Amino acid sequence: MDMGNQHPSISRLQEIQREVKSIEQQVVGFSGLSDDKNYKRLERILTKQLFEIDSVDTEGKGDIQQARKRAAQDTERLLKELEQNANHPHRIEIKNIFQEAQALVKEKTVPFYSGSNCVTSEFEEAIQDIILRLTHVKTGGKISLRKARYHTLTKICAVQEIIEDCVRKQPSLPLSEDVHPSVAKINSVMCEVNKARGTLIALLMGVDSSETCRHLSCVLSGLMADLDALDVCGRTEIRNYRREVVEDINKLLKYLDLEEEADNTHAFDLGQNHSIIKIENVLKRMREMKNELLQAQSPPELYLRSKTELQGLIGQLDEVSLEKNPCIREARRRAVIEVQTLITYLDLKEALEKRKLFPCEETPPHKAVWNVLGNLSEIQGEVLSFGGNRTDKNYIRLEELLTKQLLTLDAVDPLGEEKCKAARKQAVKLAQNILSYLDMKSDEWEY
């Protein structure tokens, strides 16, 4: 159709659709909640467009009616997606976990920086547990959920780093102000930096509405300028003291960029992350080797070569950069367990083959332990091949088989024989590790 002859109502509908299209990515990637300002802004824009669409006169013409219907459906679809993003059960789960972290920080951390409390090991364990729970929140590959999870993780992990750095660091004692007049100023700045830590933590966790990131950045930059202007008269000890305080300020300043970092696509879309890609490449090769070993007619011939390569894969995983990202850390941890489990499987197979080739006299209890190890080897092969979840009948069957082997080992009386005791202990540990591995494989974790 000639654009110059296009009906004004069609032109208006196309204009509205372009306006709606321009905010589509903002809606798809919206990671907040329904009480956020940005939610209300997007909702207001889309609702306004719906009214605009409804006001277009179709003049009873079928083509205009169809165009208006399509425009309304597109806009309503985005409104629905916006609402679903903000109210998704896993988004609410992220919110609830974050609120737990807020309560913990408000109670334990902020008072620490005012000198009325201290950071305990219980707090550190609690914050680590919160981080682990966040990494296990399912996103289903949904951009808004990945973004919300990563956004929340960056804040809580930043608090964890600030606390750990402060607790771990053994700072130099403030120099005596008698040493040089500039020392008094450095001591004063150091006190302000300590206060700024508490303010920063409160800001990151949203437990202090009286401060802003911009103002705190100005305060820290001002303290930095004050230190730069000091004349230390070439005194090495004063220069080193000043440098320590400057480094502390720089560490705090980097956390003020977290909002921007959390909006970076490559930060939350871990499928594109180079560390995750490395981990996936290792896992791909490990799975190829696993399939080859489980299907091999003469596996003993593959043992040495396979174990050497698997150890090399462990080395590759050790070199993966964690980027201070708990999701990457968890992905690497699980990959290491995957590879180590296959190595353990090969070690047990080798031991069982060696026992067949070089039989020796064994006591009945020791022989009973070896029988269990033989059973565990067969079960472990099945567990390595397992790819379901915890509701699968096969999962329940494997879990029952492993529990049965543990009960059998519990019934073995080593009769005081140390060698048998050690073998039974090792077999129990192996059975428990296989159970843990089965649980890990079936928990449907994703990054």
From Swiss-Prot:
It comes from the Eukaryota. Gene3D superfamilies: BAG domain. One of its GO terms (molecular function) is adenyl-nucleotide exchange factor activity. Detected in brain, lung, stomach, liver, kidney and testis. The keyword Chaperone applies. Keywords: Chaperone, Repeat. Co-chaperone for HSP/HSP70 proteins. It functions as a nucleotide-exchange factor promoting the release of ADP from HSP70, thereby activating HSP70-mediated protein refolding. Has an essential role in maintaining proteostasis at junctional membrane complexes (JMC), where it may function as a scaffold between the HSPA8 chaperone and JMC proteins enabling correct, HSPA8-dependent JMC protein folding. Inhibits both auto-ubiquitination of PRKN and ubiquitination of target proteins by PRKN. Binds to the ATPase domain of HSP/HSP70 chaperones. Binds PRKN. Interacts with HSPA8 and JPH2. This is BAG family molecular chaperone regulator 5. The gene is Bag5.
